[in-house]
Amino acid sequence: LKSVTIREIAKERKNLSFKALSQHINLDTVKSISKLTEEEAAKKAARDAELKAVMEGTDDRFLLVIGPCSADNEEAVLEYARRLAKLQEEVKDKIFIVQRVYTNKPRTNGDGYKGLLHQQDPSGEINLVRGMVAVRKMHKRVLTETGLTTADEMLYPENLEFIEDLVSYHAVGARSVEDQQHRFVASGIDHPTGLKNPTSGNINVLFNALYASQQKQELMYNGMEVETSSNPLAHVILRGALKENGSVVPNYHYEDLLKVIDAYKKGNYKNPFIMVDTNHDNSGKKYNEQIRIVQEVLTNRQWNEEIKQYVRGFMIESYLEDGRQEPGEGIFGQSITDPCLGWEKTE
């Protein structure tokens, strides 16, 4: 038998398992694309300071993270942002708005549209290098052309460095919240980070994730051993649950909110904050139900002082047109993933 070294075997395995589709991507080169000017960065920092005050409770405005399920079309997202910016000006004394610009989408079985990062044209080829450029461009345009800051989902923790200078709010999704790497990277984010309950609805799992995100952690991150500073602005998002038989279990009702408040009280968590996701398994993806869900939660805030104290944010899926379409149908401003509220109902 021919003698082979472990290193040669490893090299052969690497060649079999992964095929390089691009050269090594340089972080500094990527961040030089769509880089904020000093003036633009200062405007973002001012908005970020306001958001931090909302999260800490020193600013009593209600937080609204709102926008399309997926940011699939740059011009439609920008048109939505322009309208939203005008609405923010009208309600600025009561509500602080951050726009959802979700550029990568988790897929239950790996199939389907995975977001702007993967496909700049939903019907086109996959190119993640061009996707990074498109993602940065979209986040910057929303900020610089409308003054709104943006939210995105941290689907891939290793990509955080590529967008952290442009994004003001990060979310860890229901499929990712049990993953240790997501929890540990969340503990190093300098911005508010919402942790969704897992699809099972298990609140213990959710608060384990919250605890991990609010502690200092040591981990391997992008080729280095690092220690995080902890994230005191990490908080929970209630998005409902899904049973094995496919039925949904909402968790925005009065009793559900009290259970989550009780979980907050039992732990030594910083800046207690509950956000209610009005779509997904809370609405059963019946997008019009989002209006009723908001009304119910607001009523419960009036009824119970603790709910008013803890529940201080909504995450709402909204776009220019009601509902959804299949990729390629070409309806401007209508979702190609989960159905969303149209603009008139959003207003």
Give each language-model segment a name.
Residues 69-72, 271, 279-285:
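Short acidic, Gly/Ser-rich segments with clustered Asp/Glu that frequently serve as metal-coordination loops
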Residues 3, 8-15, 81, 94-259, ...:
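Active-site-facing alpha/beta catalytic cores
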Residues 319-347:
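Internal helix-turn-beta structural module
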Residues 4-8, 12-56:
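N- or domain-start disorder-to-order transition segments that initiate the globular core
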Residues 67, 276, 342:
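Conserved, mostly hydrophobic/aromatic
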Residues 52-60, 266-271:
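Glycine-rich phosphate/diphosphate-binding loops that line cofactor/substrate pockets in enzymes
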Residues 63-76, 338:
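Conserved phosphate/anionic-ligand binding catalytic regions in large, soluble enzymes, centered on
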